[in-house]
Amino acid sequence: MNFEGTYVAMVTPFTDDGNIDEEGFRSNINYLIDKGVTGLLGAGTSGESATLTHEEHRKVVEILIDEVGGRVETVAGSGSNSTHEAIELTKSAEELGADAALVITPYYNKPQQHALIKHYQAISDATDIPIIAYNVPSRTGVDMSVETIVELAKIDGVDAVKEASGSVNKVSKLYKALTKEGLEEDFNILSGEDGLTLPIMALGGTGVISASANVDPKRMVLMVDSILNDDYTRAQELHYEMIDVIDALFIESNPVPAKTAMNIMGLPAGPLRAPLTDMKDENVEILKNALKEADLI
């Protein structure tokens, strides 16, 4: 499967009593589709997947696929620090009809590089759904090397990587290594760092899985489309229009600022699930100022 464009890592809205806000989630899905996004990710990091029960995880993916109704691509988060559990979650995503699965590297147990390859190979062997590997060492404690990602690209069914190591140099080396192996046409690099999406795409990336697009989808879509159309002047303008909001959205742990911003903007988000909690007052003011300057409130 080819991944190109703007994918939104959706938040999971909750009601005041802590349940999934199905009506709000469906509303957000339609709001984002109306803004022109390529695809939507449910039950990812931005969706507070770590604190969803298995039943809630499945419900989020079910609602997503049902409400989208084939209008855009659907991606289900299905990673775990247990290979067995990751296989079961990925099977569930496939059974529910998701177009792809986003599989984060195992976290906390810090598997070796060769173990990461075996992990993704096992998931691919057990399923037929396209897999996007997710490299985010700041959260997992393990950073997939360029060499490891190239090996993943050789696995049938692993079609892309969401690269969130924060290193543009690494993306350069990765694209060069993929090209050397003749894999660059069949394996996509997707930005996992909203503020680095422009340089990552300029170096061979084909899109973004964006948390900030929950808050400012229109500009992100326009920037990504501009890059894909080789209009880097317009892309640069949009990047600078967004960058202060992007920075403010990561001033505390994602999705704390994103849900705060959405609540301020009147979009369904609701409360956070413990252990995440409300933003510090001074950071809320920084966020509000960024939203005002970007004409989002």
From Swiss-Prot:
CDD domains: DHDPS (cd00950). This is 4-hydroxy-tetrahydrodipicolinate synthase. PANTHER family: 4-HYDROXY-2-OXOGLUTARATE ALDOLASE, MITOCHONDRIAL, DIHYDRODIPICOLINATE SYNTHASE. It comes from the Archaea. Pathway: Amino-acid biosynthesis; L-lysine biosynthesis via DAP pathway; (S)-tetrahydrodipicolinate from L-aspartate: step 3/4. GO terms for molecular function: 2-dehydro-3-deoxy-phosphogluconate aldolase activity; 4-hydroxy-tetrahydrodipicolinate synthase activity. Catalyzes the condensation of (S)-aspartate-beta-semialdehyde [(S)-ASA] and pyruvate to 4-hydroxy-tetrahydrodipicolinate (HTPA). Belongs to the DapA family. Its EC number is 4.3.3.7. Pyruvate binds at residues 46, 209. GO terms for biological process: diaminopimelate biosynthetic process; lysine biosynthetic process via diaminopimelate. It holds the Pfam family DHDPS. It comes from Methanobrevibacter smithii (strain ATCC 35061 / DSM 861 / OCM 144 / PS). The record marks 45, 108 as: Part of a proton relay during catalysis. It is found in: Cytoplasm. The keyword Lyase applies. Homotetramer; dimer of dimers. HAMAP family: DapA (MF_00418). SUPFAM superfamilies: Aldolase (SSF51569). It catalyses: L-aspartate 4-semialdehyde + pyruvate = (2S,4S)-4-hydroxy-2,3,4,5-tetrahydrodipicolinate + H2O + H(+).
